[in-house]
């Protein structure tokens, strides 16, 4: 078995395994092409890792395709969650926090360290210390700052009591080198959702911004797209006539992906105090 992009799968295969299948954008044509090249297709997907309205790889859409084309299929759910170092209880708790609007403390059993920080610069110092000790560490943030596509520009600037927190986004090119890198300059480049999908590190720092806030009065999540600087994402919402519930789901999915990239520790800085208090109360850290 050899890896290949979906449009480069050679013909005459017995089996094709599609990882990150929730990210497929043209499901009908993609699967039609694959079934011309393989007898069996296994798709590995997660509805809650879809982050754009154009991504069509949902369980329901795969089932509909199979039924339309008379293809027999089986749906199997993983019994354990490999993400976050097999710390499935953390992922389950996160799902209850985000999707079930859990508003009572959970009895967290995960060994994953969760820690809240008051100052981004203190957190940055801690992450650099972890990296100097041999840990694979990364910064992540939602797409809430413009991206100049230059690692020499500090696109992310956040005022702090001890001085401004300033970072560049991760490089547009040489992303693999950034992913593998464990030098100080790699931690000075913040990853976004598009450089988080499918990846895993020892420790991460996450900036929780105002695009997702907890509203205590309504006991619900509030989405503020005015905070989002991803022009392609926002325009695709309009183009696809995305409903309010669909927008909420995609933003929640984005934070779910960002918060599940670590095996040992997740360090979070919150812009909004009410959101911070709610998340800490539910997850118990």
Feature map (PLM): residue ranges:
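Short, aromatic/basic amphipathic alpha-helical patches
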Residues: 58-67, 153-160, 277-285
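Short, basic, glycine/proline-bearing loop/turn elements
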Residues: 13-19, 172-181, 230-242
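C-terminal accessory regions
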Residues: 42, 186-285
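Flexible, charged surface loops at secondary-structure boundaries
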Residues: 8-12, 35-36, 129-136, 260
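Conserved helicase/translocase motor-coupling segment
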Residues: 52-57, 69-93, 99-221, 248
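Structural motif
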Residues: 15-19, 42, 140, 205-207
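Signature of the SF2 helicase/ATPase Hel1-core->accessory helical subdomain module
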Residues: 18-78
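Conserved RecA-like ASCE ATPase "motif II neighborhood" in helicase/translocase motors
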Residues: 1-37, 188-192, 254
């Amino acid at each position: 078995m050899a890896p290949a992009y979906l449009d480069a799968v050679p013909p005459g295969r017995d089996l094709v395994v599609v990882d990150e299948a929730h990210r497929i954008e043209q499901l009908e044509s993609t699967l039609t092409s694959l079934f011309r090249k393989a007898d069996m297709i296994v798709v590995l997907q997660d509805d809650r890792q879809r982050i754009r309205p154009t991504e069509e790889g949902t369980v329901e859409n795969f089932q509909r395709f199979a039924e339309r084309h008379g293809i027999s299929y089986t749906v199997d759910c993983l019994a354990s969650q490999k993400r976050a170092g097999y710390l499935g209880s953390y992922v389950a708790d996160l799902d209850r926090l985000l999707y079930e609007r859990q508003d009572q403390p959970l009895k967290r059993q995960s060994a994953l360290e969760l820690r809240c920080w008051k100052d981004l610069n203190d957190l940055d110092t801690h992450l650099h210390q972890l990296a100097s000790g041999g840990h694979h560490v990364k910064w992540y943030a939602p797409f809430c700052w413009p991206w100049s596509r230059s690692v020499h520009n500090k696109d992310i600037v956040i005022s702090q009591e001890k001085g401004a927190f300033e970072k560049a986004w991760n490089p547009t090119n040489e992303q693999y080198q950034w992913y593998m890198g464990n030098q100080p300059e790699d931690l000075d480049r913040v990853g976004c959702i598009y450089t988080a999908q499918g990846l895993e590190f020892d420790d991460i720092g996450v900036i929780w911004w105002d695009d997702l806030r907890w509203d205590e009065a309504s006991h619900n999540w509030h989405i503020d797209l005015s905070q989002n600087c991803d022009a392609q994402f926002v325009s695709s919402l309009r183009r696809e006539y995305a409903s309010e519930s669909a927008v909420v789901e995609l933003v929640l999915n984005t934070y779910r992906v960002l918060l599940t990239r670590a095996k040992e520790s997740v360090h979070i800085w919150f812009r909004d105090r009410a959101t911070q208090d709610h998340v800490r109360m539910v997850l118990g850290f």
